[in-house]
UniProtKB/Swiss-Prot annotation:
EC number: 2.1.2.11
Cofactor(s) demanded: Mg(2+)
Known catalytic reactions: 3-methyl-2-oxobutanoate + (6R)-5,10-methylene-5,6,7,8-tetrahydrofolate + H2O = 2-dehydropantoate + (6S)-5,6,7,8-tetrahydrofolate
Protein name, UniProt field: 3-methyl-2-oxobutanoate hydroxymethyltransferase
Molecular function (Gene Ontology), one example: magnesium ion binding
Length: 261
């Protein structure tokens, strides 16, 4: 089966299934499960590195993990997050950093922010780099927005989210992530733009959904309220390692079939 490209993500062809992955084995597993898109998210800072937010994630982190995901040769589209301060300093810095992620194996990049970064999106798209937008709750702005809170409760916020979506569309983004906005606002945005919207914590009215893998499989310590756990991998790990430890301490492992004289 051929690999997906951004041209496969068109309005009306969904719902599209997206999930995060950060390394070779998880990328291989989620791709075999049949997802449409894989996001190498800067959320790796929180779910892999134990950071309190995504601000400490570097370009080096993103390049390394994008390379690992790309080695799985997924059929799904691979999008890599542009981390904090990798594009805010201007179009040329953004272009250089986005190019690093494309060379690492990403098919596109994602950046947070709306109309204020439309010129960045336009510069990347003109250079041949597909861009996914990200509006609503933008975790890289956590220090200025007062935490991980729903966006779009006031009329001013709703108007801003809608304007941001249209600005990103006009700048050439191929898709937009809507994070933690009211479902009614997500529906309004989805109806207002002719590119796919991908919801996370924003209800059922988008063109697709995305979740963090570790929330889905039960490896997150504090998953958000909008996530659903489909497995308890943490419990499976504890059980397996406990059995291993018990067998080592009882002299049952390694057994004869596990070594050579």
């Amino acid at each position: 089966m051929r690999r997906k490209t951004v041209l496969d993500f068109a309005k009306g062809r969904g719902p599209y299934v997206w999930i995060t992955a950060y390394d070779y084995p998880t990328a291989k597993a989620v791709d075999e499960a049949g997802v449409d898109g894989i996001l190498v998210g800067d959320s790796l800072g929180m779910v892999l590195l134990g950071l309190p937010n995504t601000l400490g994630v570097t370009m080096e982190d993103m390049v390394r993990h994008t390379e690992a995901v790309a080695r799985a040769k997924p059929r799904a589209l691979v999008v890599a997050d542009m981390p904090f301060m990798s594009y805010e300093t201007g179009p040329e810095d953004a272009l250089k950093n986005a190019a690093r992620l494309i060379r690492a194996g990403a098919d596109a990049v994602k950046l947070e922010g709306g109309a204020e970064y439309a010129h960045i999106v336009e510069r990347l798209v003109k250079a041949g780099i597909p861009v996914m937008g990200h509006i609503g709750l933008t975790p890289q702005r956590v220090l200025t927005i007062g935490g991980f809170r729903m966006v779009g409760k006031t009329e001013e916020q709703r108007r801003k989210v809608l304007e941001d979506a249209k600005a990103l569309r006009d700048a050439g983004a191929f898709s937009i992530v809507l994070e933690f906005v009211p479902a009614s606002l997500a529906r309004e945005v989805t109806q207002a733009v002719d590119i796919p919207t991908i919801c996370i914590g924003s209800g059922p009215h988008c063109d697709g959904q995305i979740l963090v893998l570790h929330d889905v499989i039960g490896l997150s310590e504090r998953p958000p309220s909008f996530a659903k756990r489909y497995a308890d991998v943490a419990a499976a790990i504890r059980e397996a390692v406990s059995k291993y430890a018990e067998e080592v301490r009882k002299g049952l492992f390694p057994a004869r079939e596990h070594y050579r004289e």
